Swiss-Prot record:
The keyword DNA-binding appears for this protein: yes
Organism: Mus musculus
Record CDD domains: KRAB_A-box
The protein's name: Zinc finger protein 69
ZnF region ranges: C2H2-type: 271-293, 299-321, 327-349, 355-377, 383-405, 411-433, 439-461, 467-489, 495-517
């Protein structure tokens, strides 16, 4: 954990040591006396604390004879981290200017030829001021901006605006708002390369690439701060580099670090550019290359799940929403568990099985809902009438009976329905489609429930039983109609004469008495009938159909009434053949 907290260049470590002695001691204790590693201009590592020494102080046994804060006489290869070598023009970083510079002084060390009288241990005026916006900006040209994917454009805008806000609020940045910030706030793309002239940071980077400098200033990495003074940043804030986010609490950093993956578990990190990367900056081939060079994004790691599906593991804070694609239908999911559940629709896997009936389900939620059938639980109750339902969707559909809402309308006849399934079934009346056929007799039906009811004719199943007389029925509607005999209920009343009926079909047949309409006409003889049942009986005269067969002798009849009269003959004959019948007559 301590090793992952801070990795900083030697110049920055020296600055902290000189300006914040107590803070440097805390950092040393945090690392348990181990060395703070940093990268020099040649890409090698230097040890600042390995021998118990601090930056700016030579190790024991040094022959340079240099005192803290000074440069060894005649030494051009090794200089104390706090003071650059004489004549050196490389390795200069903001806040650590070269010897002889009059623009700023090294913290704790006066510049050569300085007339300000700054003594060691003090800082020249202005040396602690915040970095400028150019130091924290990630510059993109208009061409490079256009090559970025929309997701990376949003990421760039978010980072730039956050950096600028931190610069203004913490460092007291009072200059006029940069043009690029105004453009990003309006949702436009940056035009920094075209608008900032010779001081343009992107041109400065290209010039450095052309001269192939190999110093710390060549590093186009994430800056160490958001425009905050370096001492305040290291003292008060902990930084996570992927988005340069600062947190005042270590536990916040830990939670953020957990989402960034193993590749970004360092608070501050630095990338040394390679010389061949200059060509990539000038001729970017893809938005990913540009973003890696401009913002130094970590390379996404590929993960494999049990279905061998690839998912890119971006930090949650770096990408606004993680997406997991299905390789079969290309549907996207936010959570990997949702993708796993979706894949079962392709594989047919049903790992969740009901212990009561053995029925299997692909999702545990479906199993929980199914188990309410066995337990009788109905957790969703209507506030209007108190009726309870097993499913929330059933309750929502029921609400429409109270509100009268019918959102589903037929385009052909403008008839409205409260449920979508009712509209689908209604559309089959226009198309004539009957997709459900009986496997026994081949009779087609528009609805599957009608087929299920019809199959009971062949099987003889009668699952609906009357609790009053124990009579059984093959259809629920038949049981409902029968129960009205016991209750005396007649819910269908004629508006003309006030006569009431138990069934709707009886009311419809009765209305023809008042209207005189005979809607059913025979195509062969032209005879008309008011009722559909009478019309079907008449057609049997022409077809010769005799669907009613006697179980005693096998004789068939066209009408059910004819069969009933015939069966009375068999009952009379049985009564006469009974031996007890003669004894009763004699008595």
């Amino acid at each position: 954990m301590p090793q992952q907290l801070l990795i900083t260049p030697a110049t920055e470590a020296t600055w902290v040591k000189l300006k914040e002695v107590s803070l440097w001691e805390d950092v040393t204790k945090m690392f348990g006396g181990e060395a703070l590693l940093s990268h020099d201009a040649n890409g090698t590592q230097q040890e600042s604390l390995a021998d118990g020494t601090t930056p700016g102080t030579p190790a024991a046994g040094s022959h340079d004879g240099a005192t803290p804060g000074t440069t060894a006489t005649g030494s051009h290869d090794e200089a104390t981290p706090g003071t650059p070598a004489a004549g050196s023009h490389d390795g200069e970083t903001p806040g650590i200017p070269a010897a002889g510079s009059h623009d700023g002084e090294t913290p704790g060390t006066p510049t050569a030829g300085s007339h300000d009288g700054v003594t060691p241990g003090t800082t020249a005026a202005g040396s602690q001021e915040s970095l400028t916006f150019k130091d924290i900006a990630v510059d993109l040209s208009q061409e490079e901006w256009g090559q970025l994917a929309p997701a990376y454009q949003d990421l760039y805008r978010e980072v730039m605006l956050e950096n600028y806000r931190n610069l203004v609020s913490v460092a007291g940045y009072q200059l006029s708002k940069p043009t690029v910030i105004s453009q990003l706030e309006k949702g436009e793309g940056p035009c920094m390369a075209e608008s900032q002239g010779p001081e343009d940071p992107i041109l400065d980077v290209k010039n450095k690439l052309e001269t192939k400098e190999s110093t710390a200033e060549d590093d186009i990495s994430v800056k160490l701060d958001h425009g905050i003074t370096r001492g305040r940043l290291i003292e008060d804030d902990i930084v996570c580099s992927p988005l340069k986010k600062a947190s005042s609490y270590s536990d916040t950093l830990e939670s953020h670090r957990a989402t960034c993956g193993k590749g970004t578990r360092r608070a501050i990190w630095t990338h040394k550019k390679k010389r061949q990367e200059g060509n990539k900056l000038e001729n970017p081939e893809s938005s990913n290359v540009i973003l890696e060079q401009k913002h130094r994004k970590h390379k996404p790691a590929r993960k494999r799940n049990k279905y061998k599906l690839d998912s890119i593991d971006h930090p949650v804070s770096c990408m606004r929403a993680r997406r997991y694609p299905c390789n079969v239908c290309e549907k996207m999911f936010k959570q990997p568990i949702h993708l796993v559940e979706h894949m079962r629709t392709h594989t047919g896997e049903k790992p969740f099985r009901c212990k009561e009936c053995g029925r299997a389900f692909s999702q545990s939620a479906s199993l929980n809902t199914h188990q309410r059938i066995h337990t009788g639980e109905k957790p969703f109750a209507c506030e209007e009438c108190g009726k309870a339902f097993r499913h929330r969707s059933s309750l929502n559909q029921h609400h429409r009976t109270h509100t009268g809402e019918k959102p589903f309308t037929c385009d052909k006849c403008q008839k409205a329905f409260s449920q979508n399934i009712s509209l689908v079934q209604h559309l089959r009346t226009h198309s004539g489609e009957k997709p459900f056929s009986c496997s026994e007799c081949g009779k087609p039906f528009r609805q599957i429930r009608h087929l299920s009811e019809h199959v009971r004719i062949h099987t003889g199943e009668k699952p609906y039983k009357c609790t009053s007389c124990c009579k059984t029925f093959s259809h629920r509607a038949y049981l409902t109609h029968h129960q009205r005999i016991h209750t005396g209920e007649r819910p269908y009343k004629c508006k003309e004469c006030g006569k009431a009926f138990r069934q709707r079909i009886h009311l419809s047949n009765h209305r023809t008495v008042h209207t005189g309409v005979k809607a059913y006409e025979c195509n062969r003889c032209g005879k008309a009938y008011r009722h559909d049942s009478s019309f079907k009986k008449h057609q049997r005269h022409h077809t010769g159909e005799k669907p009613y067969e006697c179980t005693e002798c096998g004789k068939s009849f066209s009408y059910n009434s004819s069969l009933s009269r015939h069966q009375k003959i068999h009952r009379r004959n049985t009564f006469r053949d009974d031996p007890g019948h003669e004894n009763k007559r004699q008595l």
